[in-house]
């Protein structure tokens, strides 16, 4: 990597000047799209070696805290880069538009996807995987780093080979901490968040909880705390009992269940540490975890759970933009009140000022979470459709006449079915590139005829999934946009196309 110049330009993320990325790398295909940036394959000109380049648009960094978050992520990646199961950072670059993080490329796919594609899976394999994950957690904690967003999507295999290494890849929510220090901001992903995070007072023990949730899912195909809504999920996390009675748990070893119990203890003080978990007999003794394949139903559930339903997300946006004045209530006026420059979009500063005007005392990090959750297309602003989708009551969204409107949007030729070509067209319109359409169809296509009819579409829309791949929670127990502005549900069944003029 080029030696950085220690002079820091104004309005920059990095505390030093850097060479131009394109002087040293050729950018290739897009590998993935995240909440804050896009990852590309890149090739180093001097060596022809391939790397991954995460490019973060600076327009999405709307406050000084965002700049500090990116710089902290880079520092933490350097801090952990010698660990064999952490993606190694190669270098950082910055120009007037982007911050680029060049790192080791992982071409073996996500944790759950690899398991599903293998077609069989055993307790012993689960023990090896969770040992790797706990090893990363132990390393983080020993170096004074709290991850705060452990989930399967943040673990990739470095190659497609059978002996590929599992590597932690995303440290965007990670922070440095001191022993005995507590944090208070609500971050993470719904299924994996620890109860003390929801109570807004927590320490590094939250990472062990998240790893325990991953282990439960590895062995059963479903999360331990489940509900139709995110607020329901959080209630289960705070109060629910762990289910070890349903299939496949009667066939799972007592050692596995004992470790999960200890990792999912609601008391952080009683919860097992990462080091103690690594010393648990189920992990240490290679014969304690049986090598026989788990029930195939586990893999089936795992596949369903690991796929975010993008069609549902698009459909909610379509419905939100077609509701009537009466059904929308005062939301149009609220949008116009927040959008002070009448640009048709809400920026972070406008959202913050709007919340202040209605007497909200949310912290800046919480407002940023609201912004991220509502920004469906990752543009860095909230347009009118996104605002409605974030603030309207779900009962309005699920009314049949609104579902008909949404279905018709996808069913371009009016055949009564959504085909893969029509889905491709919709994805293009929504800017969802490189989306596995076959998997999206199969997820909803109950009769396996290769297309989606209205009854299948309706079942999908009314099914609670709660799966979120964003770095923040869409609706948590403490706040969402609707609650922040005091928006209440009103009853109406009319519909029409409307937008603020």
UniProtKB/Swiss-Prot annotation:
The active site is at 149 (proton acceptor). Keywords: ATP-binding, Calcium, Cytoplasm, Kinase, Metal-binding, Nucleotide-binding, Nucleus, Phosphoprotein, Repeat, Serine/threonine-protein kinase, Transferase. CDD domains: STKc_CAMK (cd05117). Ca(2+) 1 binds at residues 339, 341, 343, 345, 350. Pfam families: EF-hand_7 (PF13499), Pkinase (PF00069). GO terms for biological process: positive regulation of abscisic acid-activated signaling pathway. Ca(2+) 4 binds at residues 445, 447, 449, 451, 456. Residues 25-283 form the Protein kinase domain. It catalyses: L-seryl-[protein] + ATP = O-phospho-L-seryl-[protein] + ADP + H(+); L-threonyl-[protein] + ATP = O-phospho-L-threonyl-[protein] + ADP + H(+). Ca(2+) 2 binds at residues 375, 377, 379, 381, 386. It is found in: Cytoplasm; Nucleus. GO terms for molecular function: ATP binding; calcium ion binding; protein kinase activity; protein serine kinase activity; protein serine/threonine kinase activity. Residues 326-361, 362-397, 398-433, 437-467 form the EF-hand domain. There are 3 contiguous domains conserved in the CDPK subfamily: a kinase domain, an autoinhibitory (junction) domain and a calmodulin-like domain. The autoinhibitory domain (289-319) inactivates kinase activity under calcium-free conditions. Belongs to the protein kinase superfamily. Ser/Thr protein kinase family. CDPK subfamily. May play a role in signal transduction pathways that involve calcium as a second messenger. Functions as a regulator of the calcium-mediated abscisic acid (ABA) signaling pathway. Phosphorylates ABA-responsive transcription factors ABF1 and ABF4 in vitro. Phosphorylates the nuclear zinc finger Di19 in vitro. Interacts with Di19. This is Calcium-dependent protein kinase 4. It comes from Arabidopsis thaliana (Mouse-ear cress). The lineage of its organism: Eukaryota, Viridiplantae, Streptophyta, Embryophyta, Tracheophyta. The gene is CPK4.
């Amino acid at each position: 990597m080029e030696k950085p110049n220690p002079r820091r330009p104004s309005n920059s993320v990095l505390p030093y000047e850097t060479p131009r990325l394109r002087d040293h790398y050729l950018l290739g295909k897009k590998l993935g799209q995240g909440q804050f940036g896009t990852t590309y394959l890149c090739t180093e000109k001097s060596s022809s070696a391939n790397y991954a380049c995460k490019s973060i648009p600076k327009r999405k960094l709307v406050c000084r805290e965002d700049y500090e978050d990116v710089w902290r992520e880079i520092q933490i990646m350097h801090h952990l880069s010698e660990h064999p199961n952490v993606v190694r950072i190669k270098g950082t670059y910055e120009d007037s538009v982007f911050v680029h993080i060049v790192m080791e490329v992982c071409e073996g796919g996500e944790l759950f996807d690899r398991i599903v594609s293998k077609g069989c899976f055993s307790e012993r394999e689960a023990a090896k995987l969770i040992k790797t994950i706990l090893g990363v957690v132990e390393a983080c904690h020993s170096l004074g780093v709290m991850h705060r967003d452990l989930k399967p999507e943040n673990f990739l295999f470095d190659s497609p080979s059978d002996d590929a290494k599992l590597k932690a890849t995303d440290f965007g929510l990670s922070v440095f901490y001191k022993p005995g220090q507590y944090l208070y901001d609500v971050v993470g992903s719904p299924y994996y968040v620890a109860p003390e995070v929801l109570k807004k007072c927590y320490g590094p023990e939250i990472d062990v909880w998240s790893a325990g949730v991953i282990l439960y899912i590895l062995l059963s195909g479903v999360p331990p705390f489940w509900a139709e809504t995110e607020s329901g999920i959080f209630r289960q996390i705070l109060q629910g009992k762990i289910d070890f009675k349903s299939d496949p748990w009667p066939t799972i070893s007592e050692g596995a269940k004992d470790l999960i119990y200890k990792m999912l203890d609601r008391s952080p003080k009683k919860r097992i540490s990462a080091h103690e978990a690594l010393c648990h007999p189920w992990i240490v003794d290679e014969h304690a975890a049986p090598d026989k394949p788990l029930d195939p139903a586990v893999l089936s559930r795992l596949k369903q759970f690991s796929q975010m339903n993008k069609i549902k997300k698009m459909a909610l946006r379509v419905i939100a933009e077609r509701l009537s004045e009466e059904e929308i209530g005062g939301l149009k006026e609220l949008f116009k009140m927040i959008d002070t420059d009448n640009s048709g979009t809400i920026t972070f500063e406008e959202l913050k000022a709007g919340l202040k005007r209605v007497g909200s005392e949310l912290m800046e990090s919480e407002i940023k979470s609201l912004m991220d959750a509502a920004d469906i297309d990752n543009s860095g602003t909230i347009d009118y459709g996104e605002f409605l989708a974030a603030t309207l009551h779900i009962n309005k969204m699920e009314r049949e006449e609104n579902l008909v409107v949404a279905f018709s949007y996808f069913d371009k030729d009016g055949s009564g079915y959504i085909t893969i070509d029509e889905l491709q067209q919709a994805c293009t319109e929504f800017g969802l590139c490189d989306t596995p359409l076959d998997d999206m169809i199969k997820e909803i296509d109950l009769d396996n005829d290769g297309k989606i009819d209205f009854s299948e579409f309706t079942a999908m829309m009314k099914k609670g999934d709660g799966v979120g791949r964003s770095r923040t929670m869409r609706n948590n127990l403490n706040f969402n946009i609707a609650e922040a502005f005091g928006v209440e549900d009103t009853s109406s069944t009319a519909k029409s196309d409307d937008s603020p003029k």
